[in-house]
């Protein structure tokens, strides 16, 4: 086993144990309310800290905020990772999956605002459906030869709206 594999194994074990960490459970309880809809199998719903909408448990994640848990790149990082991962409720918030993906993209690109990350995420999702993109570009009079040109043209079209 290489050092990288060992550290990945340690990180995985620590993350799986953190799912039962009491402050994490408390954060979920603080963001929940009884569900009053038609689904008899759903008991609670959880409020996203960003969009303020309500979601079922499978559609939310517990996010470390404002300080992320980080990663383990060398053995010396384990202590700091544990301190960040096993934190108190005030360093945790509940986010819907979509907002968490957008927030993660924003964190990976310093200087990018949340709205820019939301736009980028929408653009990435659109670019995956090539037929839809080509039809949209053709409707707007664009004839693009590659993905880079399609992406630039699509960005122009969407920013005009």
Positions of PLM-derived features:
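Short alpha-helical interface elements
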Residues: 49, 73-76, 117-124
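Intrinsic-disorder-associated interaction segments
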Residues: 1-3, 7-8, 12, 16, ...
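A detector for short metal-coordination/catalytic motifs
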Residues: 89-161
């Amino acid at each position: 086993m290489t050092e990288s594999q060992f550290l990945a194994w340690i990180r995985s074990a620590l993350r799986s144990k953190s799912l039962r960490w009491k402050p994490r459970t408390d954060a979920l309880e603080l963001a929940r309310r009884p569900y009053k809809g038609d689904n008899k199998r759903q008991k609670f719903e959880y409020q996203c800290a960003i969009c303020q909408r309500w979601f079922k448990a499978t559609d939310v994640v517990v996010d470390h905020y404002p300080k992320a848990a980080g990663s383990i790149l060398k053995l010396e990082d384990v202590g700091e990772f544990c301190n960040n991962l096993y934190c108190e409720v005030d360093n945790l918030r509940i986010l819907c999956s979509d907002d968490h993906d957008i927030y993660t993209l924003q964190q990976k690109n310093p200087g990018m605002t949340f709205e820019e990350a939301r736009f980028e995420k929408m653009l990435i999702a659109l670019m995956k459906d090539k037929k839809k993109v080509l039809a949209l570009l053709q409707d707007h009079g664009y004839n693009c030869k590659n993905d880079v040109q399609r992406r630039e043209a699509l960005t122009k079209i969407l920013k005009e709206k």
